[in-house]
């Protein structure tokens, strides 16, 4: 097995043993499912978005996960307050720019968070990620309209520009810091048919980042774990409804050894310009 496969197994074992607290400021649509995904993974979720407590709450957390799915000005303020405290504490921040590129408010809010806080990982689909750069992409709501392969070169440049890790999910996931690129081939076709799978994947990245401070490695192994769980769930599911339940079971039941054997991760060099 490759070193990254072994790291994936070790990261999962660390999550199960340490149960890191993951502070989520996330959207109403996915709060319940995201919390259950984190619990099934082995982490401890907390959903806290009130400005009165976010700075205090993030001090207990192993990572901070920000999701702009159901956005308002007050939530942006909460995210910025929590982010600044997280930066002071050197706590990793994971951003999910849901629907960035679809509306000016979403795009501006995502860019503001990136500008005012040091974000460790940005996880989104290709269109969302590319909307954060100078080239505008064609975002249809929260669905991807650009392939991961089409986004690879731009993502590498954008990762270096923003000095962050970009995790672009699709049929094949791409994770890059602008210098190294990992492709993750785990996943299942039913995953896009369940609301919250992408947002939950972001939260799982937060769990892995809480135990592995090499955030490129953490994001890559997190997506492999989540994708492999999707494959396991797909074998038992008959449609999106049963898949959602089986995914929780697969996350909970997967052993580190199964992850080491089942993850499909390839590394390549980032394209330079």
UniProtKB/Swiss-Prot annotation:
Record-linked Pfam families: HK
Keywords, in A-Z order: ATP-binding, Kinase, Magnesium, Metal-binding, Nucleotide-binding, Thiamine biosynthesis, Transferase
Pathway as given in its UniProt record: Cofactor biosynthesis; thiamine diphosphate biosynthesis; 4-methyl-5-(2-phosphoethyl)-thiazole from 5-(2-hydroxyethyl)-4-methylthiazole: step 1/1
Chain positions recorded as ATP binding sites: 123, 169
Binding, substrate: 47, 196
UniProt-recorded Gene Ontology molecular function terms: ATP binding; hydroxyethylthiazole kinase activity; magnesium ion binding
CDD domains membership: THZ_kinase
Highest taxon of source: Bacteria
InterPro entries listed in its UniProt record: Hyethyz_kinase, Ribokinase-like
Glycoprotein as UniProt keyword: no
EC annotation from Swiss-Prot or TrEMBL: 2.7.1.50
Reactions the enzyme catalyzes: 5-(2-hydroxyethyl)-4-methylthiazole + ATP = 4-methyl-5-(2-phosphooxyethyl)-thiazole + ADP + H(+)
Required cofactor names: Mg(2+)
Keyword Kinase appears in the UniProt entry: yes
GO BP annotations listed: thiamine biosynthetic process; thiamine diphosphate biosynthetic process
Record-stated family: Belongs to the Thz kinase family.
Known role: Catalyzes the phosphorylation of the hydroxyl group of 4-methyl-5-beta-hydroxyethylthiazole (THZ).
Entry protein name: Hydroxyethylthiazole kinase
The organism's taxonomic lineage, starting at the top: Bacteria, Pseudomonadati, Thermodesulfobacteriota, Desulfobulbia, Desulfobulbales
């Amino acid at each position: 097995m490759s070193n990254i496969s072994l790291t994936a197994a070790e990261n999962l074992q660390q999550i199960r043993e340490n149960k890191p607290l993951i502070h989520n400021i996330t959207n109403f649509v996915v709060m319940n499912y995201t919390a259950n995904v984190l619990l099934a993974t082995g982490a401890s979720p907390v959903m806290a978005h009130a400005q009165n407590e976010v700075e205090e709450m993030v001090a207990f957390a192993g990572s901070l996960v920000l999701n702009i799915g159901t956005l308002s000005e007050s939530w942006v303020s909460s995210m910025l307050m929590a982010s600044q405290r997280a930066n002071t504490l050197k706590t990793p921040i994971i951003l999910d720019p849901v629907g960035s590129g679809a509306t000016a408010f979403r795009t501006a809010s995502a860019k503001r968070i990136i500008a005012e806080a040091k974000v460790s990982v940005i996880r989104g689909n290709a269109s969302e990620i590319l909307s954060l750069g100078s080239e505008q992409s064609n975002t249809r709501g929260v669905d991807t309209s650009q392939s991961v392969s089409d986004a690879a070169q731009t993502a590498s440049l954008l990762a270096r520009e923003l000095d962050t890790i970009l995790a672009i999910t699709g049929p094949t996931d791409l994770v890059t810091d602008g210098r190294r690129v990992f492709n993750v081939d785990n996943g299942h076709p039913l995953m896009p048919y369940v609301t919250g799978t992408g947002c939950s994947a972001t939260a799982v990245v937060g769990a892995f980042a809480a135990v592995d401070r090499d955030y490129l490695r953490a994001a890559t192994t997190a997506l492999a774990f989540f994708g492999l769980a999707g494959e396991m769930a797909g074998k038992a599911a008959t449609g999106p409804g049963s898949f959602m339940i089986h995914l929780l079971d697969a996350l909970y039941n997967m052993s580190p050894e199964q992850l080491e054997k089942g993850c499909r991760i390839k590394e390549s060099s980032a394209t330079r310009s």
